[in-house]
Amino acid sequence: MLLIQNGVILDPYTGTEQVSDILIGDDGIIAEVAAHIDAPQGAQVYDACGRTVTTGLVDVHVHFRDPGQTHKEDVFTGAAAAAAGGFTTVVCMANTIPTVDSVGTLRYVQERAAQVPVNVLQACAITCGLKGKELTDFEALHAAGAPGFTDDGVNLTDAKLCYEAMLRAKALEVPLSFHEEDPKFILSPGVNAGSMAAIQFGVPGAMPSSEECMIARDIALAQRTGARVAFQHISSALSVDLIRKGRELGADIHAEVTPHHLSLTELDVLEHGTNARMNPPLRTERDRMALIEGLKDGTIDMIATDHAPHATEEKDRPFAKAMSGITGLETAFSVCNTALVHAGHLSRMELMTAMSKNPADFYRLGDRAIAPGNRAELMIADWDEPIVYTEYKSKSTNTPFTGKPLFGRVYAVVVGETLVEN
């Protein structure tokens, strides 16, 4: 048994905050929540020391590079990074080598995921080989445990095929997640078109229209099909406006935003270079503030890291030749706490709703409230403790947040009966 004492429970499922102890049975199920619980004989006792005990973070968008590129990350190091960052559940993208578009490859990831303490779910590809030509076998993959489908990393440009995918997903009541970047508007990826960084690095960049056009199209398709759809890592003010209008029209649409798009702008690319190169790129301060407003009014309902590890030599190149993407699992809580809570934009409860409850609800992971009878998925953290990241559990260190003063330290996560301390 595990007894967590002297914690301040912050529960986004009930909207309550209270000082309580939590007793977790050997089966990983919460047995009791009370103001004071005496330790049963033989129980492991963890003193939270007045820190927050909240529901574990859920990241619906990570890349563990497993199979195929395990020099960057694998299920084991990715899970360690997730736990260090406060995440108890993550959803891996399908753009591995080979693509997760078959039951066999899905089983490979599931077998490795069964060996780590956090919940690692594996989404499957919408199209075979991410080629945008033929739909995968949704039915067989869903039956084998795929929680949803995505061609993340590439845009599904064929509108008719996208429509058919939504119909199939709706019939199975599983979600789809879309990487919305029309390549016709991307002359060079990873930097905002027309920005000072694009000029400095001598590249034309990626236009916001690449994202906005695809979102507009897929809102219409989602409205017609009734499919549950998420727009991944949105980056522009107009995208927020389009999604807001789509929600008003009744479409079952959802939106992710990354910690880096909430805290950085195109100007930061000048300082951090390739460690601030990602798809979609960082945009203007106006876009950043629109993303925050979208979070505040619920238009954007999920914060997701798009954790994208790359080897040092893949980033240590001229900007135009470097890989896009940054790591995010270990820094996400601190970055969001600093940029959103400490900056006065969101409450702690609102941040936990966006980083824990809403992502879990999108994948229908069930009731994760901190209450007797529910499986324990917890994060223990100090919101106000300063922290500077210099070392990582991830195999990769491609992040602009190294050495940056932040607030918010994760001390431990609990997944079922397992306590993982930092």
What do the predicted segments below correspond to?
Residues M1-G56:
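Histidine-rich, glycine-flanked metal-binding segment
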Residues G7, I22, D27-G28, G50, ...:
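Divalent metal-coordination and catalytic microenvironments
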Residues G7, P318-K321, R375-N422:
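C-terminal cap of metal-dependent C-N hydrolases
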Residues K133-I303:
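Histidine/acidic residue-rich metal-binding segments in metalloenzymes
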Residues V109-Q115, F138-A143:
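Acidic (Asp/Glu)-rich catalytic clusters
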Residues Q200-R228, N275, K296-I303, A308-W383:
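His/Asp/Glu-enriched, well-ordered alpha-helical/loop segment
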Residues C49-A113:
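Metal-associated gating/positioning segment near the N- to mid-region
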Residues E111-I126:
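A glycine-rich helix N-cap at a beta->alpha junction
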